[in-house]
Amino acid sequence: MAAVVALSLRRRLPATTLGGACLQASRGAQTAAATAPRIKKFAIYRWDPDKAGDKPHMQTYEVDLNKCGPMVLDALIKIKNEVDSTLTFRRSCREGICGSCAMNINGGNTLACTRRIDTNLNKVSKIYPLPHMYVIKDLVPDLSNFYAQYKSIEPYLKKKDESQEGKQQYLQSIEEREKLDGLYECILCACCSTSCPSYWWNGDKYLGPAVLMQAYRWMIDSRDDFTEERLAKLQDPFSLYRCHTIMNCTRTCPKGLNPGKAIAEIKKMMATYKEKKASV
């Protein structure tokens, strides 16, 4: 009996050894595959106004995706830290909250911190600053006009009787507060405004979707007393009425908001306001 057991063990040993060798080879192949470089190319808009004779051009960088985070901003930071420290762009929160890293990625305006890298290694990812804006350097647009327009709508609570300011709360019902959902979440990244053809051609007069959505946010706030005055400021032919419902703004918003709908609501409010004004 002992001889039979010994024979059985001897017969199994080669199979066991062979299985172990196969498993080890398989693990080795997986490790090799995991460590194989995954080189992704990024073509990035470059322009330095402080460099004499420099003209806007595209510069291509290569990044190993195995050594990079999943978002486009991760790749930009890696390029700046490890390849080219002169590359300039804005960024802050890295969580889709501040709006700093807004740029045009593969043809669409979005946030670099929330846009995942296209892992197709055969395609070059193209990155530009927000379109139709003056460029300060590389991927940094000049947002001075955008912020000035935002300031012009007085984006804060206004009361006609200020005697109670700081002495009591301005209460809202749940229903009144819910009217602000889909409006207050705007982070002023300018993705929507810079995707709007009407804003491209009339940016000096047309306020654009981002600013108009914020104007609407304060018009319908139950605590605000200046709705009619806010409407009166938009009566000219350009501030509001250059919107032609192209809806690029809604399609591109990285927060999933609907500026086009807000503008349509302002137009309806404006019609009622004008009727009321004419009847006086």
Curated annotation (Swiss-Prot):
MF-aspect GO terms: 2 iron, 2 sulfur cluster binding; 3 iron, 4 sulfur cluster binding; 4 iron, 4 sulfur cluster binding; electron transfer activity; metal ion binding; succinate dehydrogenase (quinone) activity; ubiquinone binding
Transit peptide: 1-28
Domain of life, source organism: Eukaryota
Bilayer topology: Peripheral membrane protein
Positions bound to [3Fe-4S] cluster: 196, 243, 249
GO cellular component: mitochondrial inner membrane; mitochondrial matrix; mitochondrial membrane; mitochondrion; nucleoplasm; plasma membrane; respiratory chain complex II (succinate dehydrogenase)
Domain 2Fe-2S ferredoxin-type: 40-133
Modified residues annotated as N6-acetyllysine in this record: 51, 55
Residues where a ubiquinone binds: 201
Oxidoreductase recorded as keyword: yes
Catalyzed reaction equations: a quinone + succinate = fumarate + a quinol; (R)-malate + a quinone = enol-oxaloacetate + a quinol; (S)-malate + a quinone = enol-oxaloacetate + a quinol
Main location group: mitochondrion
Binding site for [4Fe-4S] cluster: 186, 189, 192, 253
Record-stated family: Belongs to the succinate dehydrogenase/fumarate reductase iron-sulfur protein family.
Disease: Pheochromocytoma/paraganglioma syndrome 4: A form of pheochromocytoma/paraganglioma syndrome, a tumor predisposition syndrome characterized by the development of neuroendocrine tumors, usually in adulthood. Pheochromocytomas are catecholamine-producing tumors that arise from chromaffin cells in the adrenal medulla. Paragangliomas develop from sympathetic paraganglia in the thorax, abdomen, and pelvis, as well as from parasympathetic paraganglia in the head and neck. PPGL4 inheritance is autosomal dominant.
Protein name: Succinate dehydrogenase [ubiquinone] iron-sulfur subunit, mitochondrial
The species this protein was found in: Homo sapiens (Human)
Gene: SDHB
